[in-house]
From Swiss-Prot:
Entry keywords, A to Z: Cytoplasm, Iron, Iron-sulfur, Metal-binding, Oxidoreductase
Taxonomic lineage of the native organism: Bacteria, Thermotogati, Deinococcota, Deinococci, Deinococcales
EC number: 1.8.4.10
Pathway membership: Sulfur metabolism; hydrogen sulfide biosynthesis; sulfite from sulfate
Annotated organism of origin: Deinococcus radiodurans (strain ATCC 13939 / DSM 20539 / JCM 16871 / CCUG 27074 / LMG 4051 / NBRC 15346 / NCIMB 9279 / VKM B-1422 / R1)
Record: residues binding [4Fe-4S] cluster: 137-138, 220, 223
This protein's name: Adenosine 5'-phosphosulfate reductase
Reactions it catalyzes: [thioredoxin]-disulfide + sulfite + AMP + 2 H(+) = adenosine 5'-phosphosulfate + [thioredoxin]-dithiol
GO function terms (MF aspect): 4 iron, 4 sulfur cluster binding; adenylyl-sulfate reductase (thioredoxin) activity; metal ion binding; phosphoadenylyl-sulfate reductase (thioredoxin) activity
Annotated catalytic residues: 246
InterPro entries from the UniProt entry: PAPS/APS_Rdtase (IPR004511), PAPS_reduct_dom (IPR002500), Rossmann-like_a/b/a_fold (IPR014729)
Record carries keyword Cytoplasm: yes
CDD domains reported in the protein's UniProt record: PAPS_reductase
Encoding gene (name): cysH
NCBIfam families, sorted: cysH, PRK02090.1
A Pfam family assignment: PAPS_reduct
């Protein structure tokens, strides 16, 4: 059974604790087809539908702009579940600080960090694997830990922050993806970067400060650069590696 760092929404905060996560039995959920959501549908309505259809809904997040906006909308819509983050050992300090700021802002949510305390020297992967085989590095440090956790927890659906304008590889993302081990619900599928930025500014959300330095999509520091004018938001990820996705949402091992 995986050990995860869990930040619980106790009265007044409470210390950081490390405890084994027991598998939860997935509650029954409505096996209903998704409604015909459209570009003008309020994302909170999509989240409320997802909560009704999937009471065991779970939200992975890397706390990029999309993720921060979705987290705020989800809290408004009544989501009170887990926000699961994978510490690869290569995250920017600003990303970890953003996680901590979000945890303080949303005490009603439970923040779970998998691989807590990971570092480049922890022996999980060979040195510089990110350069020689980025797919293998992502699989070992990001995809596999989350896959194992989801297998233990057994959610029937995931709440995800991807949007169509992030990259050409995401241009056809639907609000609800079927197939695979579980549904993926994408309430922000039709939101533009301008909408996300406006919402974050209006609600004074704790956006990763690297975003304002041109890092429009932020992953691990060895494989992330600032985006150039006119590039997709995800163009700074694995630049020059012929790779556009970490493997969580596309490919044979997708969630």
């Amino acid at each position: 059974m995986m050990t995860a760092e869990v930040r619980t929404p106790e009265q007044g905060g409470g210390p950081l604790t490390t405890e084994p996560r027991a598998p939860r039995s997935a509650p029954g959920h409505a096996d209903a087809s998704a409604p015909a959501f459209g570009p003008e549908t309020d994302p909170r309505d999509i989240i409320r539908w997802a909560l009704a259809a999937h009471p065991d809904l779970l939200m992975p997040s890397a706390f990029n702009l999309n993720g921060v906006v979705l987290l705020d909308l989800a809290a408004q819509a009544g989501y009170r579940g887990e926000v699961v983050f994978v510490d690869t050992g290569y995250h920017f300090p600003e990303t970890l600080a953003t996680r901590d700021r979000l945890e303080s802002r949303y005490p009603e949510l439970t923040f779970v960090t998998l691989n807590a305390g990971a570092s480049p020297d922890d022996g999980q992967t060979p040195p510089d694997l990110y350069a020689s085989d980025p797919d293998a590095c992502c699989a070992a440090r990001k995809v596999d830990p989350l896959q194992r956790y989801l297998k233990e927890q057994g959610p029937s659906a995931l709440l995800n922050a991807r949007s169509r304008d992030q990259a050409s590889t995401r241009a056809d993302i639907p609000f609800v993806e079927e197939g695979g081990a579980r549904r993926r619900v994408n309430p922000l599928a039709h939101w533009t970067r301008e909408q996300l930025e406006a919402y974050a500014a209006e609600h004074d959300l704790p956006v990763n400060p690297l975003y304002f330095d041109g890092f429009l999509s932020i992953g691990c520091w060895p494989c992330t650069r600032a985006v150039k004018p006119g590039e997709d938001a995800r163009a700074g990820r694995w630049a020059g590696k012929g790779k556009t996705e970490c493997g969580l949402w596309q490919g044979e091992n997708k969630l």
